[in-house]
Amino acid sequence: MGDNKSNGDSGKLLYCSFCGKSQHEVRKLIAGPSVYVCDECVELCNDIIREEIREISPKQDQDRLPTPHELRAHLDDYVIGQEKAKKVLSVAVYNHYKRLKNATPKDGVELGKSNILLIGPTGSGKTLLAETLARFLNVPFTMADATTLTEAGYVGEDVENIIQKLLQKCDYDVEKAQRGIVYIDEIDKISRKSDNPSITRDVSGEGVQQALLKLIEGTVAAVPPQGGRKHPQQEFLQVDTSKILFICGGAFAGLEKVIEQRSHVGTGIGFGAEVKGEADKATISDVLLQVEPEDLVKYGLIPEFIGRLPVLATLAELDEAALIQILSEPKNALTKQFAALFEMEGVELEFREDALKAIALKAMDRKTGARGLRSIVEGILLDIMYDLPSTENVAKVVIDESVVKGESAPILIYEANETQAAVAEQ
């Protein structure tokens, strides 16, 4: 090490002017006018500057709020269909963050929160919409499952744990957390068992709705730092939830029947009832478009809770064409993700049109919507992903309808232009 260092013109041992280490203790010593700095101090300075830039950048990004058109355009890149829901969400999210930017509005007019309720079947894109918006806006995002929540005093997850999770996502930075988005899934599962108020305790239903009321409307939640209640002497973090956007979602199975009873859409009983054919019946998605707050009360949500979710958007069930689009068109489409995985092995992956259609039909049969697509594709590609790293000279893998149906193995195209069917192990 000493061979690479000079002791200077005078032959004296040189030291870093910042940390005091000698030239023999560091890799490099940079000389200036009567000053020396070592490589370790240079690296430390770079780290400090990079950290400061990281802290400043998000604040600069937050200064400009994307317009509803820009929000919608970003959603279009990742979410197929659901045009009305995307429009409703874009406007609601824009208004929410505009309210935060103008904390003291003119004329003393106080702007209310625009929390959102999403109604749609499993796998229709409720979670994806919320997650995509949070990522685009560069704000903390967390998810909670309403079925795990209980009111205070009961065994289960306290509603304030939701804020705890949000804080964890931003390293307990309260300022960042207060600009975050919380998505509460399965909100329909905490509906009252009947629309008549009960004198008995309903731990998983109305009680949880009551517990969520203040949190969603806006309160100062006291959250223990770093998630521990073991040290009572620690000061609790104070989080203002009036600045947090809450998006609640649920499938609301059977809600269409409540709407039909109110609006008499496609219903009729007795001899005077009009008998409609299958083609004339309104689809569930069409009926849900007519949902009113009174229908949600009848379903089991308390009026106060519905009042805290003023923005309502319904999502349609995904049909075959939409599922095919989801497989191939979005920026992070499943076929593109698996193609990238195969590319890491130096192999091209191709899904033929008939294969995409067969995958979509499988998902529809399972009634899992877009959520079930990944498990179907994983199952189809399992054997080939297992064998491929050990197989040489494969240039391309082709998936067609017969592969999806399990009637044949994927087609392998080798570099020597030799094509053969992969032999599946029995």
From Swiss-Prot:
This is ATP-dependent Clp protease ATP-binding subunit ClpX. CDD domains: RecA-like_ClpX. It comes from Shewanella loihica (strain ATCC BAA-1088 / PV-4). Gene3D superfamilies: 1.10.8.60, ClpX chaperone, C4-type zinc finger domain, P-loop containing nucleotide triphosphate hydrolases. ATP binds at P121, T122, G123, S124, G125, K126, T127, L128. Pfam families: AAA_2, ClpB_D2-small, zf-C4_ClpX. PROSITE patterns: CLPX_ZB. Keywords: ATP-binding, Chaperone, Metal-binding, Nucleotide-binding, Zinc. NCBIfam families: clpX, PRK05342.1. Component of the ClpX-ClpP complex. Forms a hexameric ring that, in the presence of ATP, binds to fourteen ClpP subunits assembled into a disk-like structure with a central cavity, resembling the structure of eukaryotic proteasomes. Zn(2+) binds at C16, C19, C38, C41. SUPFAM superfamilies: Glucocorticoid receptor-like (DNA-binding domain), P-loop containing nucleoside triphosphate hydrolases. The gene is clpX. GO terms for biological process: cell division; proteolysis involved in protein catabolic process. PANTHER family: ATP-DEPENDENT CLP PROTEASE ATP-BINDING SUBUNIT CLPX-LIKE, MITOCHONDRIAL (PTHR48102:SF7), ATP-DEPENDENT CLP PROTEASE ATP-BINDING SUBUNIT CLPX-LIKE, MITOCHONDRIAL-RELATED (PTHR48102). The lineage of its organism: Bacteria, Pseudomonadati, Pseudomonadota, Gammaproteobacteria, Alteromonadales. One of its GO terms (cellular component) is HslUV protease complex. GO terms for molecular function: ATP binding; ATP hydrolysis activity; ATP-dependent protein folding chaperone; protein dimerization activity; unfolded protein binding; zinc ion binding.
